[in-house]
Amino acid sequence: IKIIDTIWDEKLCKRGMINSWQTDIAKKECTGDWLFYLQADEVVHEKYLPVIQKRCEELLNDKEVEGLLFAYKHFWGDYYHYHNGHGWYPYEIRIIRNNPNIHSYQSAQSFRYFEYYDNPRQETGTRKLKVAKVDAEIYHYGWVRPPNLMQNKCKALNSIHWGKEKAEEYYNKAPKYFDYGPLSQLAFFEGTHPIVMQNMITNFNWQDKLQLTGKPNPYRELHKHEEFKYRFLTFIEKHFNGGKQIGTFKNYVLLKR
């Protein structure tokens, strides 16, 4: 493991672009044919490692393939509930070719090919990567925290996107604890977690602060998955579209490989 010391310039935090710039700093230090990118709240189950390695070997000389697309499980509130509805990205690029023209895009959720590089959110001179699927999932634990720490995270995250002053003003009036809402509206996880997560799961101690059933608190803003629009789209997708999301933005071109 190589740790790179960098300076986070708050002047560059507009719309989360600092995340992409920091990602590119790490990318420049990498060697090898493929680069595997994970954010701090993302984990790969050890059962997928042989699958990922085999897929990289299979596609190594297929230069049209610029990246590999992973499925996602977005856990919410605890380690037993996850999002599988409209509005949460079901796939994302997490392995890319070691190509200097490929850069982290927007606020570092994904990657693009840049003909020339000015900033992560530039409107021209970029195109989507051509990718192939890999039969593996990324487990995203970014929304599994004690409610007080989750609220702190939201404040920090929005400081990067909104600016520190606006975030301070908003969260000074917000509740101290994040309200996950009724977890019964989500899918229940029946699989196993990665071995590296076992200590975190053993120390899970905020069950009594979660709402398992009932209706959302009417005095707070609804989460996206609680809004009628998203619940309706999720119903249509699951019952009439094979679970595939309708009309969502895909930052990639999927190849048949």
What is the predicted role of each segment?
Residues 1-34:
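Active-site-proximal specificity loops/subdomain of glycosyltransferases
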